[in-house]
Amino acid sequence: MEFEMNLEQTLNEITGKMYGKNIGACTDAQLYTGVLQLTKEKMAETPVITGDKKVYYISMEFLIGKLLSNNLINLGIYEELSDILKKNGKNLADIEEAEPEPSLGNGGLGRLAACFLDSIATLGLPGDGIGLNYHFGLFKQVFKDHLQNAEKNDWIQKDSWLNNTGTKFEVAFGDRKVTSVLYDIDVVGYENGLNKLHLFDIETVDESLVKKGITFDKEAIEKNLTLFLYPDDSDEAGNLLRIYQEYFMVCNGAQLILKEVKEKGYDLHTLPEHVAIQINDTHPTMVIPELIRILTTEEGFTMDEAIDVVSRTCAYTNHTILAEALEKWPLAYIEKVVPQLDPIIKELSNRVAKKYKDEKVQIIDKDKRVHMAHIDIHYGYSVNGVAAIHTEILKQSELNHFYKIYPEKFNNKTNGITFRRWLLSCDHELAAFLTQTIGDGYKKDAEELQKLLEHKDDQAVLDAIYDIKKTKKTELVSYIKDKEGVELNPNSIFDIQVKRLHEYKRQQMNALYIIHKYLEIKGGKKPSTPLTFIFGAKAAPAYVIAQDIIHLLLVMSDIINNDPEVSPYMKLVMVENYNVSYAEKLIPACDISEQISLASKEASGTGNMKFMLNGAVTLGTSDGANVEIHELVGDDNIYIFGQDSDTVIKHYEKADYVSKDYYKKSPVIKEAVDFIVSKEVLKVGKKENLERLYNELLNKDWFMTLLDLEDYIKVKDQAFADYEDQQKWKKMMLVNIAKAGFFSSDRTIAEYNRDIWKLK
C-alpha cells in the first residue's frame, strides 16, 4: 500500500509539474505522457545488466510495438498503476491508446528481434540491440478505392521512449561523410535488470524531403538515410540507398561495440571472449568486413589476425530459403557506396576461391555479385535456422554445399515469443485465470503451462477459457466497428490470417476459399455457425501481385458485406494498417489461426505461436514451426492440409507443377478462380488488377496455390464443422494453451546462449 501511495504521489507530482493538474483532471494523452515519465524514472532506477561477455543483436528492424504496458508488467507495477488510475476515474487501457506505436519494423523478423531483447533482459543476460531510428518506418497503410495506399508513418513525438545519448560517430561513404546520433530505448526484463536498444540516426536527417505519400529523393543520403525502413528498391537508387543504410547501421554498430570493449579495458585480440555479435538475417552482414577493416587499418591487426578474431565473434541467423530474400549486391554498388570495404570483401572472396572451387559457395559470383549470406557462413562461427524443418532444409537442400564444408557450424534454434506481451499484456483475463488455476510459475517458466492439462476434464476450467475467448471476441467486434466501420457477429467463428502479404504465405488461397464459400451460400448452402474472415497485411509498394491480392480481398469484402443474402452468414474484413497493437487485439479473439504458407517456404513463423498461446486452433501446412506445434498438440488438436515440403521441393526440382492442370480437372477450383474476373467482381474492382492476378494463378502460380486448394477447402470445412461440438473445441483450446510453453522466447534465448553466445 505504501508503494502504491508513493506511485500515486509521484504521478501527481509529474502531472502537476507538466500540466498543473492532478491525475483525475488530466486527459488520456496528458496522462500517457505523465505515466511515460514515471515509467522512465522507474527504469532509470533499474540496474543495467553487466557481465564479462555481452551479445549485440544487430537487426535492420525491431518491431517493438507500444511499450507502456509491457514495461509496466516487467517492472511489476502494472496492477498498482491500473488501480491508482481507476481510483482517479481513469482507465489504463484508454491511456495506452494515446501511445504512438514505434515504426521500426515490418514483419516477423522485426517482431522476433523485439521478443528476443525482452527475453535476453528477462534472463539477466548482458545484451543490446543495434538498429536504425526510422522516422517514418515502413509506411502507414490507407485503403482507398479498394487499393492499398502508402503514407508516411509519423510516430516520433517530443516525449517518447527514445533517449538521446549524446554519442556521435562519423561514417564515411568514400569521400562522403555523415555524423550519426545515438538514441537508446531502455529494455527492462521481467523482474530483472536493464539492457538497451541502440538506434542510430543521422544528425542532418530532413523529414521535409518526403513530398507525396512515401516519395522522396533517394540520392540525398546526407538527409534521407533514416527516413524509411526498406525504401523501394525497384531501381538503382533504391538499391544503393539500402546499401547505404546497411553500412550506416553496421559502421556505427562496430564503432560502438569496440568503444565499449575498450572502455572495459579489454584487449581487442580477446574480442571473442567478451563479445558475441548475432547477425539477424543478411542485412547486417557488412559488420564482418567493417570490423576487419577497423582492426587492420586502425588497430594494427594483420589481416589474418583480424579475420580470425572476427570469425570467432560473429554468428548468423538465417530466416529464409526464398532466393530473393538472400541479399546479393552487385560488386559495383558496394564499390560505389563503401569503396573502403571493397578490398576487404575481395580479399575474403579470394581466400574462399583458393580453398573451394564450387561456384555455389563463392562470395563474389561470376556475375560480379556479392552474396551476403556466404560472407556470414564462411566468416562466422555459427549458422542457425529458426525451426526444425527449416534447419533441415538448409542443411539438406538450400545450404547443403556449405553444410558439407562446415557441418559443425549449423544448428537449429526454433523461434519463440515473449509471453509477457503475448499473454500477460494482450490477454489480462486469460493470464489472470491461468494464475488462479495453475499458479504464476508459468510467467518465469513457460513449460509450467502444461499443468493446465490436469484440468482438461474440468468443466469449469473449459467453460472459463471459452468464455474469456467470447469476451475478447466481443471487445474486438467493438474495436473493428470503431476502426473499420464493419459490424461483425461475436457469435461467429473468427478465422484470422494476419502477416506480411506475400504469395508464399498464400493469402490468395484463403481468398479463393472465401469465394468458394460465398458461392456456396449464394447457392443455398448456408453454414451452421456464421463465419468471420479477418485479414491484416501490408504489401511492399513495389510488389504488384501482392497489391492485387489486397485489391481482391477489399473487393470481396465489399461484395460479401453488402449482400443481404450472404452477410448474415459470412463477413470479411481486412483491417487497415495492421501493426503490433492491432495484433494484440486480434490474436486473443481468434478461433482458427491461418498458417497456410507453401510447405518448405516459411522458415518458422511466430504468429502461429501467439495464436496457439491464446487458445486458437491452427489450420496450416506442414511448414515452419507448424510442424513442431503439430508434434506437441497431436493430430486431434490441429488441422494440417496440403503437400509436404519434400513433395514441394521435388516439384521445384523437376519444374513439373502446372497450375492450369489443377484448374482444368477441378470444377471447384475453376469456379473460384474464374470468379476473380466475373462480371460481379469486375463491377466493383479494377480490371487490370484482377486480370493480372487471375493470369498469375493460371499461368504461373509460383507458390502452388492450386496444388493445395482442394485439400484446404476440405480440411477448413472440417474445422468449421468441428467447432459445432463446443465440448470438443474447448478441449482443443486448452491443449493448445497448455502446450505453448515450448515456444517461449526465454527458451529460445537460453538455447542461443548455451550453444552460441556462451555468456556467463
Give names to the regions the model predicted.
Residues 1-760:
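A conserved ligand/cofactor-binding region detector
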